[in-house]
Design a protein with these regions (language model features):
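N-terminal beta1-alpha1 cap of cysteine-dependent amidohydrolase-like domains
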Residues: 1-77, 183-191
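Short, functionally important structural connectors and interaction interfaces within domains
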Residues: 34, 50, 101-104, 108, ...
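Fold-independent oxyanion-binding glycine-rich loops
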Residues: 14-15, 36-38, 52-54, 84-86, ...
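A structural micro-motif
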Residues: 7, 31, 79, 106-107, ...
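Short glycine-rich loop/turn motifs that provide flexible caps or phosphate-binding loops at active sites
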Residues: 9, 15, 51-52, 82, ...
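Amide-donor transfer/coupling interface in amidating biosynthetic enzymes
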Residues: 1-2, 118-198
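Cysteine-nucleophile active-site neighborhood
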Residues: 55-136
Length: 198
């Protein structure tokens, strides 16, 4: 009889809320976590979390030492991958909004077939909380508080992406301009579907 293998979850620790993610995973699941800063550390984990933080800073730090390529390879390997806020931006296949992405050509790791809009809900001072519906099959817990701090929004999902929850909220002025650009693309006949945000 063999002992069960210990599950080890890596948390990208270049910048952002990596310690908070570690604490939540360890308390909530009992799984071991490690902070991931180098490509070598990816060899010893069963899944990875890309935490919230500042996606531009994460991208700049990750571009050193082959880390970005190693992260892309890891996410494409099929191992479990989770992105929170800035982490979701990095995992998106496409991103709009925010000068850091448009002007500086911030690279994305990709792997998640979504189009995101950075800072959809505005600046730090525009942050807010609202009730967020639980995913299908988990409604017995009721709504939970969604926290939107300079939060991105998912504007489009690929056909293989399962949407677990939706929030209807008003974008900030900058995001409204991005949405207008998408409306123009739709008018031209380009295939753009906006789901989950109004």
């Amino acid at each position: 009889m063999s002992a069960e293998k210990e599950i080890v979850i890596g948390v990208l620790a270049h910048q952002g809320a990596f310690e908070e993610h570690q604490e939540c995973i360890e308390k909530g699941t009992g799984c071991k976590t490690i902070q991931v800063r180098t490509p070598k550390q990816l060899e010893n984990i069963d899944g990875i979390i890309f935490p919230g933080g500042e996606s531009t800073a994460m991208g700049l730090i990750g571009s050193v030492g082959g880390m970005w390529t190693a992260l892309k390879d890891f996410t494409q390997s099929g191992k479990p991958t989770w992105g929170t806020c800035a982490g979701m931006i990095l995992l998106a296949e496409r991103c709009v909004g925010g000068s850091a992405v448009i002007e500086n050509g911030q690279s994305l790791i990709g792997g998640l077939d979504i189009l995101v809009c950075r800072n959809y809900f505005g600046s730090q001072i525009s942050s807010f909380e609202m009730a967020t519906p639980c995913p299908p099959g988990h409604e017995e817990g009721g709504d939970y508080p969604g926290v939107f701090i300079r939060a991105p929004a998912i504007l489009n999902v690929g056909v293989d992406v399962e949407v677990l929850g939706k929030v209807v909220a008003t974008p900030c002025r900058q995001a409204a301009v991005v949405l207008r650009e998408l409306e123009i693309k739709i008018a031209r006949g380009e295939n753009v579907v906006m789901m989950g945000v109004v």
